[in-house]
A protein has these predicted regions:
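Conserved, well-structured ligand/cofactor-binding cores
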Residues: 1-141
């Protein structure tokens, strides 16, 4: 696996740095100091998923179904269905540099600690980038 040349601190990355990452294909990783925020948010989401209190999008339906509480044994399926409902797109694929930058932007966004993902998701996405495994992303969708 390739090693990164520098760390990104979520919320502190300049536009110039993003442009450099896009144009030069430089590898970057999230600063490990972000892990505490990510872990704290993941614990909150895990507690909400198993708790009795309805939390929108975690253990309730979406949109008009927001008032529908999902049973604890169906929460994982709800989240899987949400991902599958967004797995469609049309148009030509974006170029690889744009797709790579989008992955970096997503990793940086997740590392801010507001999404509730676990740190392992961020590490896995970084590993994929380091190995040159870039998704095909359609222009729309």
């Amino acid at each position: 696996m390739k090693t990164s040349s520098f760390y990104l601190t979520p919320g502190e990355v300049s536009l110039k740095t993003w442009e450099h990452l896009w144009r030069e294909g430089t590898l970057a990783e999230i600063d490990p100091s972000a892990k505490a925020r990510v872990d704290a948010a993941a614990k909150l989401v895990a507690a909400a998923a198993t708790g009795d209190k309805p939390v929108y999008g975690i253990n309730t339906g979406f949109g008009k179904l927001a008032s529908v509480k999902i049973n604890a044994d169906e929460v994982k399926q709800l989240q899987r269905n949400l991902i599958l409902s967004h797995c469609a797109g049309v148009g030509d694929p974006l170029d690889e540099d744009a797709a790579r930058l989008m992955m970096l932007l997503k990793i940086n966004s997740l590392a801010r600690g507001a999404s509730g993902v676990c740190w392992d998701v961020i590490i896995m996405l970084q590993h994929l980038l380091a190995e040159g495994i870039i998704p095909v992303i359609p222009e729309q969708g």
